[in-house]
Amino acid sequence: MYQLAFLRCRYASPIVREARRAFHASRKCQYYIDGPQEPFSPMPGRFPKWASNGDETFGFLKDGANVFIHGGAATPSLLIKELYEYVMSKNLKDIKLFHIHTEGPYPFNDAEGHFRSTSLFTGGNCRKAIQEGRADYTPIFLSEIPLLFRRKHVQLDLALINVTPPDKHGFCSLGPSVDVTRAAIQNATHIVAQVNDQLPLTRGDASIHFSNLTVMRAGSQPCHEMSPRPASEVEDKIGQIIAENLVEDGATLQTGIGAIPDAVLSKLTNHKNLGVHTEMFSDGVVQLVQLGAITNAYKKLRPGKVVSSFVVGTRKVFDFLDNNPMVDMCDVAWVNSPVVIAQNPKPVAINSCIEIDITGQVSSDSIGTTIYSGFGGQVDFLRGAAVSLDGQGKPIIAVPSVTKRNETKIVPHLKLGGGVVTTRAHVHYVVTEYGIAYLFGKNLRQRAHALIQIAHPDHRESLEKAAFDRLKVMPSPL
């Protein structure tokens, strides 16, 4: 289906030169150490092999190989299935897998001795295996994951990716997930691509010329969808507080994953000239673009463009993404650089957490000793907003005051074994349904007081007592 005549043609040198000029002219997205190969550049005389089964696809694979897997909505399910079947049929050992969250079936964690997974951001299909010691988790900032590959801390033998069919110039697109994948394909010895006619074509850093691929495997597959959960009354209230008090017209938005960021977006329909520079976005951004609230007109970097590194959501957002010149999908090392984030006007970073203690320490990746997610870009964007060049950035942690079981999320101490993702020095604004606590520059006694004021009323008295026991002084605003 995809073996078109152009796959066997030789490109004239003017086309090659123009492609290279276009690449270097677009390097506003560049923020990395150069790898041994540049996916934008055609490799003269090289043509990938088309495979029709696992034996043809993975015949070069050996024991102990390091394998990267494209994640998120672009998870290549066909290649995952065929990799598993090939390794098991050949009895290969010690295949090490590296990825951020993947979606869909993930059989590797039940094949001890054959595979070992390392999650650089944990998804639902790996949590149980990590907790049981059958898989691993690496705590790392999303912006620094590319350095694992570029500095050769992890020597990748193979990258499995999901791409669009090549265009008339021979370029494929990584679709909705550029994130850390660009660094992986720059540094992998072999690249195996699932060529997928249902993947949205994206721009920015998303391109790879087919001559950089080792193997192409046709595999039509819809993007993995994540339907947003409707916001609760509490989450809706938090969204309203943030939208009305902390987001100004002309602000540049970063929103994380979840009901609270979605609730904030739903309350911004009357705002004007908002911009988006975010590690990820979902369906909520589409509505604001369609209503004219998001124009990106005042952004200092890539004005007029929605900038992101990956997208999750439903068919609605993938249709919006497809071949849309308004959206640039870029290398996460650049997108999430605090130095880059700080250059945009009024950057607002909206993130959530699992719990926060009375001094401002934030746990986001774990529930006690149980690994739940990862560092992601929370610290990257909180820091970028905090040091914004215009002095108008707002780094926000938004969290309901209690769990579904009425347990307070503002706690005297983080749960035993819980990891600190965002330090108390990073935290400026904390928002619950009861209001806003501003912690920047406040001492521990003042922080405890501010956080207790936005805790659930049922827990404020006990938190005051616990704060006194911990700090040896009563919480006070002065």
UniProtKB/Swiss-Prot annotation:
GO terms for biological process: acetate metabolic process. Residues 1-30 form a transit peptide. CoA binds at G256, I257, G258, A259, I260, I354, G377, K404. It catalyses: succinyl-CoA + acetate = succinate + acetyl-CoA; propanoyl-CoA + succinate = propanoate + succinyl-CoA. Coiled coil: none annotated. Its EC number is 2.8.3.18, 2.8.3.27. It is found in: Mitochondrion. Keywords: Mitochondrion, Transferase, Transit peptide. It is an enzyme of class 2 (transferase). One of its GO terms (molecular function) is propionyl-CoA:succinate CoA-transferase activity. The active site is at E279. GO terms for cellular component: mitochondrion. InterPro entries: AcetylCoA_hyd_C, AcetylCoA_hyd_C_sf, ActCoA_hydro, ActCoA_hydro_N, NagB/RpiA_transferase-like. PANTHER family: ACETYL-COA HYDROLASE, ACETYL-COA HYDROLASE-RELATED. Belongs to the acetyl-CoA hydrolase/transferase family. Transferase involved in anaerobic fumarate-respiration in the mitochondria. Catalyzes the transfer of the CoA moiety of acetyl-CoA or propionyl-CoA to succinate, thereby forming acetate and propionate, respectively. Acetate and propionate are the two major metabolic end products in the anaerobic mitochondrial metabolism of F.hepatica. Also displays CoA transferase activities from acetyl-CoA to propionate, acetate and butyrate. This is Succinyl-CoA:acetate/propanoyl-CoA:succinate CoA transferase. It comes from Fasciola hepatica (Liver fluke).
